[in-house]
Curated annotation (Swiss-Prot):
Cofactors named for this entry: Fe cation
Cellular compartments per GO CC: chloroplast stroma; cytosol
UniProt keyword DNA-binding present: no
Matches recorded under Gene3D superfamilies: 6.10.250.2840, FAD/NAD(P)-binding domain (3.50.50.60)
Major place of residence: plastid
Annotated family: Belongs to the THI4 family.
Naturally occurring in which organism (per UniProt): Sorghum bicolor
UniProt xrefs under InterPro entries: FAD/NAD-bd_sf, Sti35, Thi4_fam
Disulfide linkage: none
Biological role: Involved in biosynthesis of the thiamine precursor thiazole. Catalyzes the conversion of NAD and glycine to adenosine diphosphate 5-(2-hydroxyethyl)-4-methylthiazole-2-carboxylic acid (ADT), an adenylated thiazole intermediate. The reaction includes an iron-dependent sulfide transfer from a conserved cysteine residue of the protein to a thiazole intermediate. The enzyme can only undergo a single turnover, which suggests it is a suicide enzyme. May have additional roles in adaptation to various stress conditions and in DNA damage tolerance.
Protein name per its UniProtKB record: Thiamine thiazole synthase 2, chloroplastic
Length: 352
């Protein structure tokens, strides 16, 4: 059955803005009343007893071999299914998860997420300096409304009381969809490149990848993909690996690294410069700052969400599907439509 453009993208880009909370000079910077579709009312919390007797609870019997077979059969089936897929997303931080969420709205697109850590989410489990709150500048709060994440609202930004509320919500919504598989504890060791185009990734168990120097040779596996989205984060021992590998193999000339912190410039630049940097590979999130020399962003997260969504629509465009980049899906909000500008691939380094 054909999917219409209107039904394909029921996202924050077609949503209505929430009015800013009215503040007086004596008001706190952040309004205390939670806003957003996920705001919880005390009356909605059920106080009923569990549907079983806790004093004499017993589980149904099971053979240990059944548990082993269920895990093994399902995982191996997923490996076979996603050995050749539409999109592979490398890195399950806030940008990668936002990209996967947006992409998976089209049920005909198969998506594999590869995350080296056992626990996906990247740096989005906390705000800055290990603090709990997550700050999101408007109008990216519309994405939170879509997800149903509650927040406190100020005039130009919103605050989620704990960053884990965003990460756990987008992850649970995403992984419930049948066209997505998260392969966590799996590392991407290299790219598949054929005829100047990225055509997939080379994978290995993360623990194996971390111990190549101490063990004998352990060859990897592969996943072919029509599009690879690299969301590996900023530079570090495990960061920006996608663009650094492109430089190693001569597909790009330079990875200048991100500049000093400038929140206002950085978030706009990261969204604007999210793009297909070489045929078959889209870069999103903080990895964009590494390849373009944009400023570092600091502890605000709106650009990660919107960059991920933009990467999803660039992937849809590459797949020949309706998308919000070339206008085959209409974006209602003019402010958000301006974010969807494809940066020139010729401009490799950006002066910020």
């Amino acid at each position: 059955m054909a999917t219409t453009a209107s039904s394909l993208l029921k996202s924050s880009f077609a949503g209505a803005r929430l009015p800013a909370s009215t503040r007086t000079p004596s008001s706190p910077a952040v309004v205390a009343t939670p806003r957003g579709a996920g705001a919880i009312r005390a009356s909605s919390i059920s106080s009923s007893n569990p549907p079983y007797d806790l004093t004499s609870f017993r589980f149904s019997p099971i053979k240990e071999s059944v548990v082993s077979r269920e895990m093994t059969r399902r995982y191996m089936t997923d490996m076979i299914t996603y050995a050749d897929t539409d999109v592979v997303i490398v890195g399950a931080g806030s940008a990668g998860l936002s990209c996967a969420y947006e992409l998976s709205k089209d049920p005909s697109v198969s998506i594999a997420i590869v995350e080296q850590s056992v626990s996906p989410g990247g740096g989005a489990w906390l705000g800055g300096q290990l603090f709990s709150a997550m700050v999101v500048r408007k109008p990216a709060h519309l994405f939170l409304d879509e997800l149903g994440v509650a927040y406190d609202e100020a005039e130009d930004y919103v605050v989620i009381k704990h960053a884990a509320l965003f990460t756990s919500t987008v992850m649970s919504r995403l992984l419930a969809r049948p066209n997505v598989k998260l392969f966590n504890a799996v590392a991407v060791e290299d790219l598949i490149v054929k005829g100047g185009r990225v055509g997939g990734v080379v994978t290995n168990w993360a623990l194996v990848s971390m111990n190549h120097d101490t063990q004998s040779c352990m060859d990897p596996n592969v996943m072919e993909a029509k599009v690879v989205v690299s969301s590996c984060g900023h530079d570090g021992p495990f960061g920006a690996t996608g663009v650094k590998r492109l430089q190693d193999i001569g597909m790009i000339s330079d990875v200048p690294g991100m500049k000093a912190l400038d929140m206002n410039t950085a978030e706009d630049e990261i969204v604007r410069l999210t793009r297909e940097v070489v045929p078959g590979m889209i870069v999103t999130g903080m990895e964009v700052a590494e390849i373009d020399g944009a400023p570092r962003m600091g502890p605000t997260f709106g650009a990660m969400m919107i960059s991920g969504q933009k990467a999803a629509h660039l992937a849809l465009k590459a797949l020949g599907r309706p998308n919000a980049v070339d206008g085959t899906i209409k974006v209602v909000s003019p402010a958000l439509r301006q974010e969807f500008v494809i940066a020139s691939k010729d401009d490799e380094v950006v002066d910020a």
